[in-house]
Swiss-Prot record:
Pfam families: Ribosomal_L34. This is Large ribosomal subunit protein bL34. Keywords: Ribonucleoprotein, Ribosomal protein. It comes from Borrelia turicatae (strain 91E135). One of its GO terms (biological process) is translation. One of its GO terms (cellular component) is ribonucleoprotein complex. PROSITE patterns: RIBOSOMAL_L34 (PS00784). Belongs to the bacterial ribosomal protein bL34 family. The lineage of its organism: Bacteria, Pseudomonadati, Spirochaetota, Spirochaetia, Spirochaetales. The keyword Ribosomal protein applies.
């Protein structure tokens, strides 16, 4: 059986990246909450590139 998690950087950033969050009202609310909480990484696209 194929595992459910098949990682892809492109798909991940398109779905959960900063620009994807900024597109919707709900996404902007998520960013606002994470800023208020003091998160160093707001979205997955803020993670350091491994290469």
């Amino acid at each position: 059986m194929k595992r459910t998690y098949q990682p892809s950087r492109v798909k991940r950033n398109r779905k959960f990246g900063f620009r994807a969050r900024m597109k919707t009202k709900g996404g902007r609310l998520i960013l606002a909450r994470r800023r208020a909480k003091g998160r160093s990484k707001l979205t997955v696209s803020d993670e350091k590139k491994k290469y």
